[in-house]
């Protein structure tokens, strides 16, 4: 029997706010354990939560960018469970009335476009973190670090529309790109800023009844998500075919073995005894507020890619690379604003700029060659002042100092030679010294042409205008 996977993803997005969702404590990562806490974080009796307005704004941004309906009224609820990293004994989340509902994202897998529904986006606080290691003054054991408690999260819940690990990864990558573009999340998966719970079940092909699902918790890389889902699909099919039954449970993924293992029985919503939080009034969001937030949204990657293709004539590949990050897209846009030709700017941003950034181990936001200076360099190429090859030498010089490209060209005597008389003289000398190759060319061996071009460029120290060289050389070789 053939089986079809049914996958739904719950993505936790840690918001890039300076302070926590219900108090004024810092959200900075990596601080000393329990150094960023207060009575609210610690769940002290009588401590009252106060909602961070920036968290609501970020949630609205996420909802608009994923085509959701923004609820005019939403409610916070207490999710009750006991765990050492949850000192209150409940987590403040949203249940029946989340802030965003009924959205979607379109993904592309193997050239096919597919729409993945988004059930809801809700705001919640994160829990603390258990630390299993040597604890100063206590020896080996387990401790609780509550710095992360009350850190603001969005939980983005997809519909069970995903049918393969590849579709899941495509959806996650698109969602990750959007939240980073919006500036609401740093996207650091290693630090847990963007992590995923994968709900997986299988059913016979053609069936409309979903199988029993398992939930694999807190997978924090695209590669691990793919491995975890593929393993779980294979495990469930094998179990069913051997006459067993899939148990609804929570599982953990082991990146070393590439396998999932049982963690605990899967809870249902009623197990958490949700009820409205009496310390937080319902959140009312006006249409004007939503409209103001909508005006602040950046142009999103998909819209930008479409514009680059239709308005600038760039290829699908170029548009994809240039919009990979908001910083790169904005650098490219700044080049265009300074007067750079679109295709030339695209080639240089994807080529020399990216190469130099990778070698320096830095991001484009810290690029020492500003868009304006790069544009000035490209304009020298367009005017024929320097060749593309010489431009790379000039660019390397620009990387190490703040001189204008014109000044570097002048100082180093790199102006391109377009004087036909000077170039003809070089060609004549090279042809006279290589009559054997001249005869080969005239005998039909056209590959020899490249040899002569190389000799001329070498003799001119790379300064000869390649277009002029090709034209004159071809004319002389043909006699």
Curated annotation (Swiss-Prot):
* Enzyme class label: ligase
Cross-referenced Gene3D superfamilies: 1.10.10.410, GatB domain, N-terminal subdomain
- EC number(s): the record gives 6.3.5.-
Per UniProt, what is one Pfam family of this protein?
GatB_Yqey
Q: Does the keyword Ligase apply?
A: yes
Q: Which GO terms describe its biological process?
A: glutaminyl-tRNAGln biosynthesis via transamidation; translation
Key words of the record: ATP-binding, Ligase, Nucleotide-binding, Protein biosynthesis
Key word ATP-binding present: yes
For this UniProt entry, the molecular function terms from Gene Ontology, in alphabetical order, are: asparaginyl-tRNA synthase (glutamine-hydrolyzing) activity; ATP binding; glutaminyl-tRNA synthase (glutamine-hydrolyzing) activity
Q: Which InterPro entries match?
A: Asn/Gln-tRNA_amidoTrfase_suB/E, Asn/Gln-tRNA_Trfase_suB/E_cat, Asn/Gln_amidotransferase, Asn/Gln_tRNA_amidoTrase-B-like, GatB, GatB_C_1, GatB_Yqey_C_2, Gln-tRNA_amidoTrfase_suB_CS
- Reaction catalysed? L-glutamyl-tRNA(Gln) + L-glutamine + ATP + H2O = L-glutaminyl-tRNA(Gln) + L-glutamate + ADP + phosphate + H(+); L-aspartyl-tRNA(Asn) + L-glutamine + ATP + H2O = L-asparaginyl-tRNA(Asn) + L-glutamate + ADP + phosphate + 2 H(+)
Q: How the protein assembles, per its UniProt entry?
A: Heterotrimer of A, B and C subunits.
Family according to the record: Belongs to the GatB/GatE family. GatB subfamily.
Function summary: Allows the formation of correctly charged Asn-tRNA(Asn) or Gln-tRNA(Gln) through the transamidation of misacylated Asp-tRNA(Asn) or Glu-tRNA(Gln) in organisms which lack either or both of asparaginyl-tRNA or glutaminyl-tRNA synthetases. The reaction takes place in the presence of glutamine and ATP through an activated phospho-Asp-tRNA(Asn) or phospho-Glu-tRNA(Gln).
The name this protein carries in UniProt is Aspartyl/glutamyl-tRNA(Asn/Gln) amidotransferase subunit B
What is the species listed in this Swiss-Prot or TrEMBL entry? Geobacter metallireducens (strain ATCC 53774 / DSM 7210 / GS-15)
């Amino acid at each position: 029997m053939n089986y079809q996977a049914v996958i739904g993803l719950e993505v936790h997005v840690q918001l890039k706010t300076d302070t926590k969702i219900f108090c004024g404590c810092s959200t900075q990562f990596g601080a000393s354990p329990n150094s960023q806490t207060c009575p609210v974080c610690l769940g002290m009796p009588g401590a009252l939560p106060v909602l961070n307005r920036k968290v609501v704004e970020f949630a609205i941004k996420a909802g608009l960018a994923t085509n959701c309906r923004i609820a005019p009224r939403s409610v916070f609820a207490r999710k009750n469970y006991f765990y050492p990293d949850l000192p209150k004994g409940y987590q403040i989340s949203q249940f029946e009335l989340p802030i965003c509902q009924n959205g979607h994202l379109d993904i592309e897998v193997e050239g096919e476009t597919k729409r993945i529904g988004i059930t809801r986006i809700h705001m919640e606080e994160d829990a603390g973190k258990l630390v299993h290691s040597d604890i100063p003054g206590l020896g080996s054991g387990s401790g609780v670090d509550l710095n992360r408690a009350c850190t603001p999260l969005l939980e983005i819940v997809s519909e069970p529309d995903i049918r393969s690990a590849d579709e899941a990864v495509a959806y996650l990558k698109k969602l990750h790109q959007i939240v980073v573009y919006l500036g609401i999340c740093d996207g650091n998966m290693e630090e847990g800023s963007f992590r995923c719970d994968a709900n997986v079940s299988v059913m016979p092909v053609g069936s409309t009844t979903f199988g029993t699902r398992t939930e694999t918790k807190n997978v924090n890389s695209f590669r691990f998500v793919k491995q975890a889902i593929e393993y779980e699909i294979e495990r469930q099919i094998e179990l069913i075919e051997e006459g067993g039954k899939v148990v609804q449970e929570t599982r953990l993924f082991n990146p070393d073995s590439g396998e999932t293992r049982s963690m605990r029985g899967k809870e249902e919503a009623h197990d958490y005894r949700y009820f409205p939080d009496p310390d937080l009034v319902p959140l009312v969001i006006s249409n004007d507020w939503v409209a103001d937030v909508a005006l602040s949204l950046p142009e999103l990657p998909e819209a930008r890619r479409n514009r680059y293709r239709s308005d600038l004539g760039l290829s699908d590949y170029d548009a994809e690379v240039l919009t990979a990050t908001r910083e790169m897209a904005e650098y490219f846009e700044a080049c265009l604003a300074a007067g750079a030709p679109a295709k030339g700017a695209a080639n240089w941003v994807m080529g020399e700029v990216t190469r130099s950034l990778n070698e320096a181990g830095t991001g484009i936001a810290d690029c020492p060659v500003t868009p304006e200076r790069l544009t000035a360099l490209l304009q020298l190429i367009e005017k024929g002042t320097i060749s593309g090859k010489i431009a790379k030498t000039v660019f390397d010089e620009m990387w190490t100092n703040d001189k204008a490209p014109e000044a570097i060209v002048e100082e180093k005597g790199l102006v391109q030679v377009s004087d036909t008389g000077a170039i003809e003289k070089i060609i004549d000398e090279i042809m006279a010294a290589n009559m054997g190759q001249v005869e080969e060319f005239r005998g039909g061996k056209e590959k020899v042409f490249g040899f002569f071009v190389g000799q001329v460029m070498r003799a001119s120290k790379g300064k000869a205008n390649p277009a002029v060289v090709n034209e004159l050389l071809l004319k002389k070789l043909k006699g």
